[in-house]
Design a protein with these regions (language model features):
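Pocket-lining segment of extracytoplasmic ligand-binding domains
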Residues: 187-190, 194, 199-289
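Conserved C-terminal helix/tail region of periplasmic/extracytoplasmic solute-binding proteins
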Residues: 327-369
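Secondary-structure end/capping motifs
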Residues: 256-336
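C-terminal motif of bacterial Sec signal peptides marking the signal peptidase cleavage site
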Residues: 22-26
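Short, solvent-exposed loop/beta-turn-alpha elements that line the ligand-binding surface or hinge
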Residues: 74-82, 186, 236-240, 308-318
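Bacterial signal peptide processing site
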Residues: 28-31
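Short, glycine-/small- and polar/acidic-enriched structural segments
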Residues: 34-194, 211-214
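Bacterial N-terminal signal peptides that target proteins for export
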Residues: 2-16
Length: 369
């Protein structure tokens, strides 16, 4: 039997590290992104694996920049040929995992916590992490009038996106490292941890109902635009200042039956990341344009610019940090120790990277045997 805390985690941790800035979902899974993919299909192209379409999911967050840019610039469609790239946008991890399990999407960009939770709940049968996408982009932003140093966080009200999500677990772990005590489930203790949806966190900050927030981008930069101060960048707590914020997952069934299609999507991802690195300003504009297309609202420059700078695009899933994030959840009492063996299958990604003369990546011993 799962413990009460584990049940709470299954509702919370799957909400994902990259929770929504924008309200995108219009149905139970997400909303179809507006696109003109048919117009981008090259004449004479052939279908991959005989598929009419490949269904790709992602969040309307800058931490999903690879998917945003690849959609906007047509990289997915280019690699899929006459197989149509179809898109769904999501605003929470559980709905994307549900969509993957039901076949509503085949491949998705998602945070580490829902990937861990989806994998463990299915006893390792529903998904594989097949690549990385982004690192960083998480900050502790506070009201500088109330909090002037890290020790001042004690006794204050600090928001995280959701019980058991990646930022929530990271903040609880940081609190414990300070020697302070907080009940993980209630959020009560030496610090009041206030679980607040990212959509309303800026308003909660403006109203004074919270004193700060441990949140991903671009929510962090929205708080700064409202007068907040970055007190801590989570990247400073990790070796080499790198930790996974977004991974690429695939249905195990789809991976087994359509490896060529999966390889095509991974090739598009690698090519997109290369283009982003070479053209950061154009890529930033492309990501924002896709956000606007998906949601009807682009980010203002005072939010977009600092948020973009704090996110590192990467092909590496940073597997060792996923294991550490799971250990933090166990330490907080929000997760029973998971068996993550087999959560990664980086075979196709490393094939693509080798063909592109790029460095291959490691699964930290958590790959398919």
């Amino acid at each position: 039997m799962r413990s009460t805390r584990s049940k709470l985690l299954s509702r919370g941790i799957a909400a994902a590290v990259t929770l929504p800035l924008l309200a995108l979902a219009a149905c139970s899974y997400g909303s179809e992104a507006k696109d003109d993919t048919k117009a981008k299909v090259a004449a004479g192209s052939e279908k991959i694996d005989g598929l009419d379409s490949v269904k790709i999911g992602y969040f309307g967050n800058l931490t999903h920049a690879t998917a945003l840019v690849a959609n906007q610039k047509g990289y997915f469609q280019k690699e899929l040929g006459a197989t149509e790239a179809k898109y769904q946008t999501f605003n929470a991890g559980p709905s994307e995992i549900e969509a993957l399990n039901s076949g509503s999407i085949d491949i998705g960009w998602i945070g580490p916590s829902p990937a861990i939770n989806g994998f463990t709940k299915s006893k390792g049968t529903n998904l594989r992490i097949i690549g990385g996408s982004a690192s960083g982009g998480v900050k502790l932003v506070v009201n500088p009038k109330k909090i002037k140093s890290l020790k001042d966080v004690k006794g204050k009200k600090i928001a995280t996106p959701q019980l058991g999500n990646t930022q929530d677990v990271a903040f609880l772990n940081w609190i414990a490292d300070q020697g302070w005590n907080v009940d993980a489930n209630s959020g009560k203790g030496d610090v009041s941890v206030v679980r607040t949806d990212n959509k309303i966190t800026p308003d909660a900050y403006k109203s004074g109902s919270i004193d700060g927030a441990w949140v991903p981008e671009p929510t962090a930069s929205k708080l700064v635009a409202e007068g907040g101060k970055v007190l801590l960048d989570e990247s400073t707590l990790w070796p080499d200042k790198k930790f996974v914020i977004t991974n690429i997952i695939v249905s195990q069934k789809f991976l087994k039956e359509h490896p060529k299609a999966v390889e095509a999507v991974l090739k598009a991802s690698v090519e997109t990341n290369k283009w982003i690195s070479a053209n950061p300003d154009e890529a930033k504009a492309a990501a924002n344009k896709q956000l606007e297309a998906d949601s009807g609202k682009a980010l203002p420059a005072d939010v977009l610019d600092p948020a973009w700078k704090s996110i590192q695009i990467t092909n590496d899933p940073l597997a060792s940090t996923l294991n550490t994030e799971a250990a933090h959840a166990v330490k907080a009492g929000l997760l029973e120790k998971p068996d993550l063996s087999g959560i990664y299958d980086l075979t196709l990604l490393n094939k693509v990277l080798k063909a592109d003369d790029e460095s291959t990546v490691d699964d930290a011993g958590l790959g398919v045997k």
